[in-house]
UniProtKB/Swiss-Prot annotation:
Up-regulates the activity of the Rho guanine nucleotide exchange factor ARHGEF18. Involved in the regulation of the circumferential actomyosin belt in epithelial cells. Promotes cellular adhesion, migration and motility in vitro and may play a role in wound healing. May have a role in mediating cytoskeletal changes associated with steroid-induced cell differentiation. Residues 413-424, 502-517 have a biased composition (Basic residues). Residues 85-369 form the FERM domain. Keywords: Cell junction, Cytoplasm, Phosphoprotein, Tight junction. It comes from Homo sapiens (Human). May be negatively regulated by phosphorylation. Its main location: cytoplasm. GO terms for biological process: actomyosin structure organization; positive regulation of cell adhesion; positive regulation of gene expression; positive regulation of keratinocyte migration; wound healing. This is Band 4.1-like protein 4B. The gene is EPB41L4B. The lineage of its organism: Eukaryota, Metazoa, Chordata, Craniata, Vertebrata. It comes from the Eukaryota.
């Protein structure tokens, strides 16, 4: 009786008959019970339209279905029942399946029909999802009737989706299951639900192309093909080019291997498999609860602020629209304390749905077998929800399923979109096209920097990061010789270095980078990469950055550069053409070698001018010098110098007659400890042990200059104890000043070789006075850093041989009015015997045959450019004294370099 009254006078019944009357009056159609179509006119209208997806739109954001899908499939499973349910299910590949079920069919019946149609074995990871009137997504409960769960219909629209994302995709045994997982992840990324970094998105898209299209064939496949696919919501042309480049690296992978690589890459994403639900806290702010295999994540906006592991959650219940979580955490003392968190949702139905999803996630990922679903208590006196997890767990799905021998399935092609209109334009102008696409989407990085045209359009374009495009270009490809005119990068970065440009010449033991002059190339190799180098004059323009204004021909640009070069070099005088010794057979001329870049000259400092004057004074007086020159036992045949000729470096001619004696103005020399430490890159507070010990050695004085054993030590006096005595005081005390000459050697004049005075050492050097202790020649044998100069010695160094230079001895002049910081240096030679170094200053030892001696002067010398701020000194009174002073200075500089 109650059923009759409900069926006759119920609200649903009255609405149904009202629709039937309206349909009969309008089109002659009635309800399905009156012989009309299933669901009446509303159902007929809804069957022609696409259903809404769980995300709130017809399809995921990003436009249209992911795959093309197939023809609509109809499954009649109602049997002989008169009343049927009409359900429409949309699969992951875009196929629509319509199913007729009995009136009281449950969710399990519909799910079994879909699984049977797909021929799917691992069914525990999937489910059917639908939307309610509030556009909230719900999972179809397999244990309840469909009509009681879905209030919108008929027809009932559902979506077949992945419900539980496997924590380890390698546990998925079926290839078809992995294929469905890939389709689901592609849906999530395209809709924006699953966020992934740029590089990861590029790699995943390349794997999709490899799985669907196979190998990347360069003549057939182009970047235009990638633009026909959709992988992320905001897909740019720059990203498509990167996908194409990555696709070429996936060569050799089968579709199954590419899909497995896709899953193994996607499982490391932060939001992989996270089921997000929006809630509100007690403060009224919105939060997001994410259900994962390990626990519940809490997000505030995009920031993760908490994680509750499943073992730590002791209680989770709901009451109306309020969800309560009780979490156990250990305090500082190791005691467990309970913390209660309360969240609110929009409605009681939404709150219950979140609670059910949390229970299912916990049971599927944490339990081995589901608990007993039947309760001992009666349903009449039971409080709360009767929902219990009824499916299989992940452990059962992984260990309990059987493998099929064979299984076949068809991979549906992805939906294609029209390619970009300017893809052909990008092929001919890749740099400009990259700039255009980077402006449209600033979030995606540019695979090429912006292009500043400073070359005439008729010239072929070049860029240092030009991609290796495989498709044919309409413009000719630049060869290595054609690319030479574009050796300078417009944006001031590193130049394009090839085998033809950017050569580095290695002279001696240091790398000196020279500037190459040619008619067609100009390559700047600057050591200072922190900022552009500018010319010394403040008014001169920078040479490392060209003006990106009006395009000009390269000839005009070369003329402009040459003009700037002449303007900047004008202050330093003309530079000789650089001679490049390619065959290494001919010796370079002295005047053709330089340590400075011709395009970037530095202004001539005062202290440099002083040394230049000295060198020119010596050249002017060389013709007046008489006498022989003291020769050493070993003659340096291949003597080389990396410094520039003094005649070239000197800006103005100097007359010898203008020199005045320097006795009237004694030189005041600055402290030398800091200069020495700066010269040899030593720290004043952290010197090497040998050098630190040499600092403390007190200099001994002697009046006998003809002793048999003479030792030259190199102390580093501090400014407090440094004493520079004038020549008059040194003569009064019986001491020989560094620039003095011995009475026995006063009459012996000597000449210089052509390159002797070309060593430009403007940096001051510490005092070196004679001592009496003989030691080995290098610092590894004795702490005091001394050089033995004994005439007859048989001391053999027990260490491996080292490279050294031949040091010549020069007489000392006591009448020299200039105070010199260097003492007399006896002759120094080094011989090899049995891989040991023997130091002997004079003639060779009779124990060692002359045939076994190998002069060390054949080794390439080391030249170091020294920049100082030494004050200029006055000119010498005569050319003879200047020459002697420079010669001794050069000799002691070599001695110090050999020791250090």
């Amino acid at each position: 009786m109650l059923r009759f009254l409900r069926r006759t006078f119920g609200r649903r019944s009255m609405q149904r008959y009202a629709r039937g009357a309206a349909g009969r009056g309008a089109a002659g159609l009635g309800d399905e019970r009156d012989g009309g179509p299933r669901g009446g006119p509303a159902a007929a209208a809804s069957s022609s339209a696409l259903p809404a997806a769980p995300g709130g739109s017809v399809f995921p954001a990003g436009g249209g279905p992911l795959l093309t899908g197939g023809a609509a499939v109809h499954i009649s499973a109602a049997g002989a029942a008169k009343a049927t349910l009409y359900c429409r299910v949309f699969l992951l590949d875009g196929t629509e399946v319509s199913v007729d079920l009995p009136k009281h069919a449950k969710g399990q019946d519909l799910f079994d029909q879909i699984v049977y149609h797909l021929d799917l074995v691992e069914t525990d990871y999937f489910g059917l999802q639908f939307l309610d009137s509030a556009q909230v997504a719900h999972w179809l409960d397999h244990a309840k009737p469909i009509k009681k769960q879905m209030k919108i219909g008929p027809a009932y629209a559902l979506h077949f989706r992945v419900k539980y994302y496997s924590s380890e995709p390698n546990n998925l045994r079926e290839e078809f299951t992995r294929y469905l997982f890939v389709l689901q992840l592609r849906h999530d990324i395209l809709s924006g639900k699953l966020k992934c970094p740029y590089e990861t998105a590029v790699e995943l898209a390349a794997l999709c192309l490899q799985a669907e299209l196979g190998e990347c064939e360069l003549p057939e496949h182009t970047p235009e093909l990638v633009s026909e696919f959709r992988f992320i919501p905001n897909q740019t042309e720059a990203m498509e080019f990167d996908i194409f480049q990555r696709w070429k690296e996936c060569r050799g992978k089968s579709p199954a291997q590419a899909e497995l690589s896709y899953l193994n890459k996607a499982k490391w994403l932060e939001m992989y498999g996270v089921d997000m639900h929006v809630v509100r806290g007690r403060d009224g702010c919105e939060y997001s609860l994410g259900l994962t295999p390990t626990g519940i994540l809490i997000f505030e906006g995009a920031n993760k602020i908490g994680l509750f592991f499943w073992p730590k959650i002791t209680k989770m219940d709901f009451k109306k629209s309020k969800l309560t979580l009780v979490v156990v955490e250990d305090d500082d003392q190791g005691r467990e304390q309970e913390h209660t968190f309360v969240f609110r949702l929009d409605s009681a139905r939404t709150c219950k749905h979140l609670w059910k999803c949390a229970v299912e996630h916990h049971a599927f990922f944490r339990l081995r077998t589901p608990g007993n679903s039947k309760s001992n208590r009666s349903d009449f006196i039971r409080l709360g929800s009767r929902f219990r997890f009824s499916g299989r767990t992940e452990y059962q799905a992984t260990h309990g399923s059987r493998l099929r021998r064979t299984s076949t399935f068809e991979r549906k092609p992805s939906k294609r979109y029209p390619s970009r209109r300017h893809s052909t334009f990008k092929a001919s102008n890749p740099v400009i096209a990259a700039q255009l696409c980077s402006k449209t989407n600033p979030e995606v990085h540019n695979y090429q920097p912006q292009y500043h045209p400073n070359i005439h359009p008729s010239q072929p374009r070049w860029h240092p990061h030009s991609p290796n495009v495989s498709y044919p270009l309409p413009s000719p490809v630049l060869s290595s010789s054609d690319r030479l005119p574009f050796g300078i990068e417009e944006n001031g970065g590193t130049p394009f270095l090839t085998a033809a440009s950017g050569r580095h010449h290695h002279q001696h033991q240091h790398q000196h980078q020279h500037q190459h002059h040619s008619n067609y190339s100009l390559s700047l190799t600057l050591e200072n990469k922190e900022g552009p180098l500018r010319s010394p004059n403040s008014s001169s323009k920078s040479l490392t950055k060209l003006s990106p204004g009006t395009p000009a021909l390269f000839s005009e640009a070369a003329a402009h550069l040459k003009k700037l070069e002449l303007e900047t070099v004008k202050a330093a005088g003309p530079w000789p053409p650089l001679h490049i010794n390619i065959n290494k057979a001919e010796e370079k001329k002295v005047s053709e070698k330089t340590l400075q870049t011709p395009l970037l000259p530095s202004p001539v400092a005062d202290h440099v001018k002083c040394n230049i004057l000295k060198a020119q004074l010596e050249n002017a007086s060389r013709v007046n010098i008489q006498g022989g020159k003291e020769e050493s036992p070993f003659v340096n045949i291949n003597k080389k110098s990396s410094l520039q000729d003094a005649s070239v470096r000197s800006p103005i001619p100097i007359r010898v007659e203008t020199a005045q004696p320097a006795v009237e103005k004694p030189e005041i020399k600055p402290p030398r400890v800091r200069k020495l430490t700066r010269q040899y890159s030593f720290d004043e507070d952290d010197l090497p042990p040998d050098l630190a010990e040499a600092v403390g050695v007190t200099t001994s004085t002697t009046t006998n200059t003809t002793t048999a054993a003479t030792q030259v030590s190199v102390p580093l006096p501090s400014p407090k104890v440094q004493n520079v005595s004038s020549p008059h005081k040194s003569e009064g005390k019986g001491l020989l000043s560094p620039g003095a000459k011995s009475p026995s050697d006063r009459g012996g004049a000597f000449t210089l070789e052509p390159g002797d005075l070309l060593m430009d050492f403007t940096e001051a050097t510490p005092l070196a006075e004679p001592a009496s202790n003989p030691h080995c020649a290098h610092s590894r044998c004795s702490p005091p850093l001394s050089l033995p100069m004994k005439e007859e010695t048989t001391g053999v160094c027990m260490y491996p041989p080292i490279k050294t230079r031949l040091i010549k001895t020069f007489p000392v002049d006591t009448m020299n009015p200039f105070p010199d910081t260097f003492t007399t240096g006896p002759q120094f030679t080094a011989d090899f015997r049995d891989s040991k170094l023997q130091c002997c200053p004079g003639p060779t030892s009779p124990l060692i045959p002359a045939a076994t001696l190998r002069p060390l002067t054949e080794t390439v010398s080391t030249v170091q450019t020294i920049y100082t701020t030494r004050k200029p000194v006055s000119l010498a009174a005569s050319a003879e004294t200047l020459r002697q002073e420079l010669e001794r200075e050069k000799m002691m500089k070599r001695l110090l370099m050999t020791e250090l």
